[in-house]
């Protein structure tokens, strides 16, 4: 921005400088060569593809093209808050042992760490070697449900909820049985090509089929 300055003549023939107030004219922004002001990877005003395409269509000269010039100054690049060059002054604590970790390590070597809280027995802790037995007992004790009687003519299976785990564990229904053919608001949906052969073919020896895997 610039201010208009007028030279006002006086009666004695001298000339005094008079600045007219509140009259500002916009000045054209100065373009700087990108290589002269930028020494980092960070670009405060990164040119977009649209700007570069526009300058290419306008056949702008190199000193006018946004790919080689910028309105940013050198101090704006120097004071950038992000850069991928150089080593940070203060490295992250996660890259090395923290101060708390060093204290605990020293106390551990000195034998000053507190023992296990009273009431907790190591025998009661979960043992990974008994995981298979625990899982087998858990699955065998899981509840089962029966499907309704199939003697009725209009019997559908859509919407019946099934689960892998007991309700005490999952608290939600994860899977639902779907019926083929099924209906939507437009009518009957197309029948899949493998619906009638679901229980006739046993799949390939190189892949496991979902219906051969028990869900209970």
Curated annotation (Swiss-Prot):
Protein name: Sperm microtubule inner protein 8
Keywords associated with the record: Cell projection, Cilium, Cytoplasm, Cytoskeleton, Flagellum
Organism: Homo sapiens
Gene: SPMIP8
One GO CC term on file: sperm flagellum
Superkingdom of this protein's organism: Eukaryota
Subunit description: Microtubule inner protein component of sperm flagellar doublet microtubules.
Cysteine-cysteine disulfides: none
Tissues in which the UniProt entry reports expression: Expressed in testis, prostate and placenta.
Subcellular localization: Cytoplasm, Cytoskeleton, Flagellum axoneme
GO biological process: flagellated sperm motility
Statement: the UniProt record of this protein carries the keyword Cell membrane: no
Primary localization: cytoplasm
Cytoplasm among keywords: yes
PANTHER family xref list: TESTIS, PROSTATE AND PLACENTA-EXPRESSED PROTEIN
Function of the protein: Microtubule inner protein (MIP) part of the dynein-decorated doublet microtubules (DMTs) in flagellum axoneme. May serve to reinforce and thus stabilize the microtubule structure in the sperm flagella.
């Amino acid at each position: 921005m610039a201010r208009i300055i007028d030279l006002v003549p006086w009666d004695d023939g001298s000339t005094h400088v008079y600045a007219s107030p509140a009259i500002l004219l916009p000045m054209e922004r100065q373009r700087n060569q990108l290589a002269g002001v930028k020494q980092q990877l960070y670009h405060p005003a990164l040119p977009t593809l649209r700007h570069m395409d526009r300058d290419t269509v306008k056949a702008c000269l190199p000193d006018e093209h946004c790919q080689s010039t910028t309105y940013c100054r050198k101090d704006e690049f120097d004071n950038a808050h992000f850069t991928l060059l150089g080593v940070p002054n203060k490295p992250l604590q996660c890259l090395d042992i923290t101060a708390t970790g060093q204290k605990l390590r020293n106390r551990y070597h000195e034998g000053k760490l507190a023992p296990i809280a009273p009431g907790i027995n190591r025998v009661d802790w979960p043992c990974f070697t008994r995981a298979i037995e625990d899982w087998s007992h858990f699955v065998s004790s899981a509840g089962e449900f029966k499907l309704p009687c199939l003697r009725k003519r209009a019997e559908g299976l859509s919407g019946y909820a099934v689960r892998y785990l007991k309700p005490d564990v999952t608290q939600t229904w994860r899977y639902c049985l779907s019926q083929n053919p099924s209906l939507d608001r437009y009518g009957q949906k197309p029948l899949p090509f493998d619906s009638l052969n679901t229980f006739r073919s046993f799949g390939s020896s190189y892949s496991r089929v979902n219906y051969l895997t028990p869900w209970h």
